[in-house]
Amino acid sequence: MKSYEELLSDIEEDMELMGSSHIVYSMEEDDIVTDYDYLPSDSCTISITLKELQEKLQLQMLYTKVSAHTAGADKNAPKLAVVFPGIGYTADKPLLYYTSRLASKHGYKIRTVSYGTLPENVKGDPEKMKQAFDLALEQTERSLGSIDWNSYGSILFISKSIGTVISSAYASRHDLTVKSILFTPLAETFSFPLAGSIAFHGTADPWAETDSIRKLAAQKDAPLFLTQNANHSLETGDVLTDIFILKTT
């Protein structure tokens, strides 16, 4: 059976050749897509557009990431999800709120990091950005210092923007085996090991250039999902489109 990454790569190639609205036929086992073909068959019976199939697979990947235990861990052990907000994108905003809800539904205890007061207007100012990173990481160390990481069967980091840098740095510093959901990561995020990570980026994000993020993600073997014309909040400015993005991210 093909991996999610292999299926998504095939879909991207087919979308370039035939268009996103081209109809294909998917093979599913227990509502999980396992393959697809261009013509219906005994195994591939569900008609679906390439775009819809891509979005369904992305959602499946996210569910798999959230629901699974860490390899080799005690499946009866508790699970912990830690939320790392952005500077202005707090934990009660849509991407973090709904992902946390999803994690909670799958049995994770939710913990949110608070950075305290950080420098403002950091975009385009490397000195302020480094200061914000150092302060946020220091507060993260204090906030999470009492956690016995070995007591959890699965650890999930849910992060946004500068939070993706903080979460990746923290996991690396403490040699933690974690799964990470990286919403709108910065280039600096990819300075750290990202095994077990999945990333989401908008092609109109003014904080991170798409080609650069694509290359960096490929270097780290981190699955990257692009939302066309979406900004740093993965929003497009069109309400109906933004609701659709939330449903499929």
What are the functions of these language-model segments?
Residues 230-244:
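Catalytic histidine-centered segment of alpha/beta-hydrolase-like enzymes
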Residues 199-201, 205:
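Short beta-strand/loop motif that positions the catalytic acidic residue
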Residues 15-41, 47:
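Acidic, low-complexity, intrinsically disordered interaction modules
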Residues 158-167:
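Gly/Ala-rich beta-loop-alpha elbow adjacent to hydrolase catalytic centers
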Residues 176-185:
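A conserved short beta-strand
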Residues 48, 57-151:
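Serine-hydrolase catalytic machinery in alpha/beta-hydrolase-like enzymes
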Residues 206-212:
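Conserved alpha/beta-hydrolase "acid-adjacent" motif
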